[in-house]
Amino acid sequence: MDQPPNDHAPVDWYFDFISPFAYLQWHRLKKEAPSLALRPVPVLFAALLAHWDNKGPVEIPPKRGWTYAHCLWIARRHGIAMRLPAGHPFNPLPLLRLSIALGNTSEVIDRLFAYVWRDGLLPDSAADWQRLLDELGATPAQLDTDTVKATLKANGERAIAAGVFGVPTAAVGRALFWGVDATDMLLACAAGDPFFSSAEYRRAFALPVSLQRKRS
């Protein structure tokens, strides 16, 4: 993260279907930067949280409602259709594995995001899930292969090695941009904004810690 980005490298985009912020950024990037060389990488958000000893935003009670309201507001501002699912958090593994099994194409990612965040449906709704599988020409057995599971695990290991701690995160070279709030910053970097070669930008990653909070 402390190195200048490589403007010619593809943008690795780490995401999990569990994240409403990933859904929102996916649509923003498609609309605002259709020529961006985006390389989507599905990862299990819970594994990132466990590795970095962190909590997701909806695991903090006062933050939970705010998170959903904020997402709805962002969707409204950007003209993105959004409907909260029947429950959240939920188990995203079937969605992640289905995306990998079907080649992780933009069309597949679009449809799976829409299933949850446009239509408000979940993988644990058996009838709805079967309809989705039928629509995509997929079978439950495709989600359960060793190859699919190994790919998802490898994606997570790759994300952690890159320093990814949350979703969505975009990597432009070694520079990481976390969250839908960083979309404008990401696009500026990808466009070669000189800020990302500045001494002040570099200093942000070398700032000393003055005080460490004690944890019980």
Task: Report residues per predicted region.
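C-terminal cap of thioredoxin/glutaredoxin-like
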Residues: 4, 9-10, 18, 22-36, ...
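Short beta-strand/turn micro-motifs composed of small residues
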Residues: 15
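Structural alpha/beta surface segment adjacent to cysteine/selenocysteine redox centers
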Residues: 21-116, 200-216
